[in-house]
């Protein structure tokens, strides 16, 4: 082989050997670029995820704020509920019932309008309290029960303080009574009316209680027994009369 031919073969071999190295270098560079792109994309996605998570957490925190109970405990621990329950509203005593759910911030937003409509802050100022908006009095109508209680108390009022309560007067003898049915029974003395008649003997009475006691005379029931001689009577008054025979009174 001539010298020129050998040189030509050497150049061809060198060129053939050089091409795979260049391809390998290009392939390695491509792989490095792919890895960098994947890393950058992963970083971008992670940053996006973090942003979305932070946004969602902030949105959730805005929608549902964490309740701060310390402020509410501080507020309601200083309130005198006994005085607030007896507070005067518009000049009249009205009870105020407290809703437990209104002590919490989340439920507070639902009932805030009730505070503005049903409560007057000047009433609390008269008591020396500065009541915040979380206080929601639910006014209940207890007028019927209060009226019955007042009527019951009025029946025990001293007559000397209220004056003469015997406003029912007899038109025959001018005797006065505190109840109308007592006046009706009294008038039967003047008229002689005895509407309650015994069905056994025909005896009549002005009052039903007298007829009930009379009916015992027609039965064998004698509940009033003497403790000394075991003699029985159908009326307590007869037993009292009999007891005088033992005491010589």
UniProtKB/Swiss-Prot annotation:
Cytoplasm as UniProt keyword: no
Effects seen without this gene: RNAi-mediated knockdown results in defective formation of the distal end of the two M2 pharyngeal motor neurons.
Alphabetized Pfam families for the sequence: zf-C2H2
Residue spans of biased composition, Acidic residues class: 24-52
InterPro entries, sorted: Znf_C2H2_sf (IPR036236), Znf_C2H2_type (IPR013087)
GO MF, one annotated term: zinc ion binding
Record GO biological process: nervous system development; positive regulation of axon guidance; regulation of transcription by RNA polymerase II
Role, per record: Required in the M3 pharyngeal motor neuron to guide the growth cone of the sister M2 motor neuron during axon development.
UniProt-listed PANTHER family: KRUEPPEL-LIKE TRANSCRIPTION FACTOR, KRUPPEL-LIKE FACTOR 15
Protein name, per record: Zinc finger protein mnm-2
Organism of derivation: Caenorhabditis elegans
Organism lineage string: Eukaryota, Metazoa, Ecdysozoa, Nematoda, Chromadorea
Gene: mnm-2
């Amino acid at each position: 082989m001539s010298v020129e031919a050998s040189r030509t073969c050497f150049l061809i071999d060198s060129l053939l050997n050089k091409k795979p190295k260049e391809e390998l270098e290009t392939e390695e560079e491509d792989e490095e670029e792919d890895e960098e792109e994947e890393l950058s994309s992963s970083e971008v996605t992670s940053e996006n995820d973090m942003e979305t998570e932070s946004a969602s957490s902030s949105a959730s925190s805005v929608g549902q704020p964490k309740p701060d109970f310390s402020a509410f405990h501080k507020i309601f621990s200083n309130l005198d509920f006994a005085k607030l329950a007896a507070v005067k509203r518009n000049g009249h005593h009205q009870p105020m019932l407290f809703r437990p759910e209104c002590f919490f911030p989340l439920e507070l937003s639902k009932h805030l309008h009730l505070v503005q409509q049903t409560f007057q802050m000047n009433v609390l100022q008269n008591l020396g309290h500065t009541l915040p908006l979380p206080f929601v009095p639910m006014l209940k109508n207890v007028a019927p029960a209060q009226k019955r209680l007042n009527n019951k108390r009025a029946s025990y009022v001293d007559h000397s303080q209220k004056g003469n309560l015997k406003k029912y007067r007899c038109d025959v003898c001018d005797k006065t009574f505190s109840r109308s049915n007592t006046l009706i029974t009294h008038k039967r003395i003047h008229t002689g009316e005895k509407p309650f008649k015994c069905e056994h003997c025909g005896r009549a009475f002005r009052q039903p209680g007298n007829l009930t006691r009379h009916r015992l005379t027609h039965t064998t029931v004698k509940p009033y027994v003497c403790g000394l001689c075991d003699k029985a009577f159908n009326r307590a008054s007869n037993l009292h009369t009999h007891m005088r025979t033992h005491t010589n009174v």
